[in-house]
Amino acid sequence: MDYKELIKIALDYRSRAYIPYSNFNVGAAVLCESGKIYGGCNIENASFGATNCAERTAIFKAVSEGESKIKAIAIVGSLSEITYPCGICRQVISEFGDEDVKVILAKSEEDYIVKDMSEILPGAFKREALGK
């Protein structure tokens, strides 16, 4: 899969964000092991704890459709700088992917960096720690 295609999908989902409080839109696109792609945007709520990030929206959508393993995720924020996933999203990405999951952090289809999951969440807490 071409990273630019995944970024393009994330950019499309970014425009769908529901952000009446922060005015900070984020889009994400997840490539699953099956080859299917799922997109998501951030969705805010007046009760801020009920807000959901774009990364989790995309991953939860994929899991709810029967996916269990992700290979890559593209994330596009609205800043002029690269937008990294929050700590909760890093943990969720780690739950459904290996240490080598590609995390594509983009400003545009032409301006992006690629990190392995192990770079952005070293020492991730995994199910094996629970004896699973």
What is each model feature region?
Residues K36-I37:
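Hydrophobic "anchor" residues
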Residues D2-R16, E67-K132:
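C-terminal binding/interaction regions
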Residues I19-S22:
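Short loop/turn motifs at secondary-structure junctions and domain boundaries
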Residues C41-N42, G49-R56, F60, E81-F96:
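Local cysteine-cluster metal-coordination motifs and their immediate loop/turn environment
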Residues L31-C32, A106:
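Short beta-strand-to-turn element immediately C-terminal to the catalytic PLP-Schiff-base lysine
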Residues N45-A46, I120:
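A short acidic/small-residue loop/turn micro-motif
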Residues N25-L31:
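Short beta-strand scaffold segments in enzyme catalytic cores
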Residues K61-E65:
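Active-site- and interface-proximal helix/loop "cap" or "latch" segments in soluble metabolic
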